[in-house]
Amino acid sequence: FRYAFVTDDEGFKVLDITDPVKPKLIPGATVPLKHAQRFYLARTYAYVADGEDGLAFIDISNPEKPKLERLYNADGKLNDVRAVQIGSVNASMFALVADGKNGLRVLQMISPENVPTHMGFSPVPNPKLIATYPTHGPAVAVSRGLDRDRVVDETGNQTVVFGRRGSRPFRQDEMEKFYKHADGSLYTVEDVAAKSGELK
């Protein structure tokens, strides 16, 4: 509810949209990328199409401090990356990558064979290029699959229901109750660590 992620000529950026009418760029929340284009958010990662540099894996577990974990280019084979979509089948996660002049690429990101912690909440991806499909022209986009969610407009009103039926989505004022006090200030927690069983 509080963050928007964008790409521009400088790279991948995070905006604070606690007040959607007054979005603010978060200081220090920019990951420089030379060719940042479309991206996909999945759990604690942002996967960013980064042109000739391949696919950027950005840790967004703390959205106010995103960090580049790695750039993956499959030994130079991914060199015109324009867009990415992530999907899962059984215990494996895949990335469909529009790799421009090279066509459509399929990466196996997580599987029981290559990621021992594949059943965890957000396992560290270990990408492997497993397929290429040549396209008639440059592959510049990948159609977004059915994410089984609802589309809402800027005011929180439902505009579309995808693969399921049920209650309506929350309105803006209802969402704010999850992260704001009645006076408008944000709910916060103290960032503490445990060492030898004691909080520090």
Residue ranges, per PLM feature:
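Feature marking well-ordered beta-strand scaffolds used for ligand recognition
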Residues: 1-200
